[in-house]
Amino acid sequence: MRIMLQRFLPSLKIVLLLLAAATPARSAENNASAPLDVSGRGALPSNDAAPGATWKDSPFSPLDFSLRAGLASDYIYRGTTLSAHQPVVGAAVEASFSLFYAGATAASVKLPTNPAAELTFNGGIRPKIWDIDFDFGWTYLQYPGEAEGASTDYWETFARGNYKLTDAVSIAAGFAYSPSISNAGAWSKYAATGLSVELPRELLPNDIGVSLSGVVGYFWFGNQAPALGGFPLPAYTHWNAGVTFSRKMFNLDLRYSNTNLSKEDCFVFTGDPGAVPGGRINPINNPDGLVSNWCGPTLVAKLWFALN
């Protein structure tokens, strides 16, 4: 049976680590290297991974706000596309107070259940312990306007940490868990690690920051609900590598992404409505031998601005 889980495992857009180099208003510590995003969540980089101009003298101080908006040539989440390899737009807002934060994002998607958009709501705490920047939180994913009878909303908890080896080099690791990915009855677990290197600023034009980064993640699952076949979703590894350019509030990320999913398992995992026959037949989860290109090698360009 085909699983409409594709959104759920949206692709690892892990646009991780947008280096904080280009923001004159930021402190020397922040300019060194922004946290690497190993969450794989969202059509935009996570707030703590995106450099931008600072909203100074906020009347709500010490309550801080951030805003991000942009577009991308594809929406890759944990290695698979959530936009059928079509361009997307997205925006995000976040409020933080001391260690605590809450935020929301909206992004265009193209999924089997035809939702109007992907909305995410998240919150958590970001403490610093032993020079490690931690992030413990939860995310609720909502897909309004789905086809009649479909409901793939779900929630996920996560923990991740970022550590600076030097002012220019950061490593990160994260773990996420959902009791029912895409409301399909199957639990999901996700683990990832990443590395980022900021190029020396003396080698670059004024106000330009450049970083190289990469992430490797592993996604595995339990059995789906009996109504969806009761079989386990295919576990897989994904990876990406790219370069991020930053100048003040503007950011450009160019990234290569791929997974080790076969085209047949890609269909099983995503439920791609455009899948075609011609692959290996599996009488349990793919009796027609359908194949999908939603999980293969992809080049993604992403442009956005960030106000922090």
Regions found by a protein language model. Give the residues of each.
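Solvent-exposed loop segments that connect transmembrane elements
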Residues: 223-232, 263-291
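Transmembrane beta-strands of outer-membrane beta-barrel proteins
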Residues: 65-69, 91, 100-104, 121, ...
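Outer-membrane beta-barrel "beta-signal"
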Residues: 195-199, 245-250, 276-281, 291-308
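Short loop/turn motifs that connect adjacent beta-strands in outer-membrane beta-barrel proteins
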Residues: 53-64, 113, 128-133, 149, ...
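Detector for outer-membrane/organellar transmembrane beta-barrel domains
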Residues: 154-234, 256
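Transmembrane beta-strands of outer-membrane beta-barrel pores
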Residues: 71-77, 97-99, 106-110, 127, ...
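Residues that define the transmembrane beta-barrel architecture of outer-membrane proteins
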Residues: 61-63, 85-89, 115-119, 132, ...
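Outer-membrane beta-barrel biogenesis signature
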Residues: 26-67, 77-80, 200
